[in-house]
Amino acid sequence: MNQMVDMSHAVPTARGLREARAFAPASVANVAVGFDLLGYPLDGVGDTVTVRRIDAPVVRIAAIRGTTVALPLEAERNTAGAALMSLRAALALPFGFELEIDKGIALSSGMGGSAASCVAALVAANALLDTPISTDQLYQHALDGEAVASGSRHGDNLGPLFLGGLVLCTLERLVPIAVPEAWHSLVVHPEAVLETRRAREALAGDYRLSEFVAQSTNLALVLAGCHAGDADLVRAGLRDVLVEPRRAPLIAGFAQAKQAALAHAALGASISGAGPSVFAWFETRAAAAAAAPAVQAAFAGVGLDSQAWVTPINSPAARLLA
């Protein structure tokens, strides 16, 4: 969607800025063992948001372009718009924001598209404030924005976009998790759509205590392995016994794709976010790149084209653009 944008009402900040633009990458959330807790950025693909400071005390979306345009222009129904509405209300700002969203992340891909728009909007808007606020404060407004898309406040796609790298995300704080620089992630996105709300509905039902114990054990192994740089610990723990068994049937070719990654020495593989994308961890970039064709072939075997990305787990956070 293309629309003419009226710049006549853009208000300069105390630092002279009328407009700011920010990029936020895609992300992998849950990471098999940390449902709604763990995530990391996926460098190389993401959303760009341009924000203008305007006289009118409102938030409005002027345009949405790119890979996904079937998104609400109403600010309160859009994660980026809702996040800026939360920011305005909390700071009692006398001015408003106008934004344009350029989407680079496919809708309902399990790659954090709603979070990317949300964080990019906040990073850009923060640059337009007379007194920018802290990352912790921005994170709280991002949680408000993300709730529009998923129906609940959770930060596993948001935290990594503020800090970069693997991040443990509670509702109150963000904790960076050290990961060896050499470790890389492979993410493969099959050209299929799995709505986040439908994926969450699949999780309804009873869970056994033994499942929670096993999942807690796996989370501890992964965190300890990352901290120590011990690939064997991560390999022992990077498996999902709670969520994956309930969501995997919704993703055609998932079992074959996961097996292909493990056959190429992945430390582990599972569903990225709500799916249908799949992620896998490897000790080197070369190993991740070598596995990509096999994982894509698994999806091709069920009639799905796909895209693949190989990036460091320690990929960078969202950033302002010149």
From Swiss-Prot:
In which pathway does this enzyme or protein participate?
Amino-acid biosynthesis; L-threonine biosynthesis; L-threonine from L-aspartate: step 4/5
Q: Which GO terms describe its cellular component?
A: cytoplasm
Q: Which UniProt keywords apply?
A: Amino-acid biosynthesis, ATP-binding, Cytoplasm, Kinase, Nucleotide-binding, Threonine biosynthesis, Transferase
Residues the entry annotates as binding ATP = 106-116
- EC number in record: 2.7.1.39
Q: GO biological process: what's one of them?
A: threonine biosynthetic process
The record's subcellular location field reads: Cytoplasm
Q: Name one GO molecular function term.
A: ATP binding
Give a single Pfam family match.
GHMP_kinases_C
Transmembrane annotation, as ranges: none
- Give me the reactions it catalyses: L-homoserine + ATP = O-phospho-L-homoserine + ADP + H(+)
Q: Is Ligase a UniProt keyword of this protein? A: no
InterPro entries linked to this entry = GHMP_kinase_C_dom, GHMP_kinase_C_sf, GHMP_kinase_N_dom, Homoserine_kinase, Ribosomal_Su5_D2-typ_SF, Ribsml_uS5_D2-typ_fold_subgr
Primary location: cytoplasm
NCBIfam families per record: PRK01212.1-4
The UniProt similarity line reads:
Belongs to the GHMP kinase family. Homoserine kinase subfamily.
General function of this protein = Catalyzes the ATP-dependent phosphorylation of L-homoserine to L-homoserine phosphate.
User: What is the protein's name according to its record?
Assistant: Homoserine kinase
Question: In which organism is this protein found?
Answer: Xanthomonas campestris pv. campestris (strain ATCC 33913 / DSM 3586 / NCPPB 528 / LMG 568 / P 25)
